[in-house]
């Protein structure tokens, strides 16, 4: 069942911020563009939000409007090279955290420690790790969730139906290879902005 953005209930455990005017602005922009929401948002203060398919810069704009609409206090990672002033200040205010991607294993460990040491942290990640076509997807987000002992919610940006799909929740990450098949199956039914860039099988 599709609902208007402002009709979605956000649980008491979900960390929130943003003033009323940004909440109204986010709702207005999504309504104006015809976007709706389907499903329920995870009621946790720590979680990985796997947002896909990520094939366009528009994905960030849609995601940001959702964050404003729900008043979500979330974090996301970006290349350290974009965190220069004054842009870096704005990105940090929006929840951005700079990372260097030269050492993937070190990045995972660093994120895990940040989650463990934080009182609350909703971390939005693109499971593909790139806007370019790729298969298999990168599994760093699953390793982070497993090592930090936090759940993963799958969130789809369906451009065909203009729906933000709040999908299934993986409460415990254990068998990553098997659980990735569940993830591929979910996103196979979500239409990307550029469908040719979203690959959910090896064919």
Identify the meaning behind each predicted range.
Residues 10-15, 32, 36-189, 198-203:
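Soluble catalytic domains of membrane acyltransferases
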Residues 2-7, 118, 195-196:
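Intrinsically disordered, low-complexity regions
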Residues 24, 194-197:
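Long hydrophobic alpha-helical segments that form multi-pass transmembrane helix bundles
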Residues 1-36:
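Extreme N-terminal tail/first-helix region
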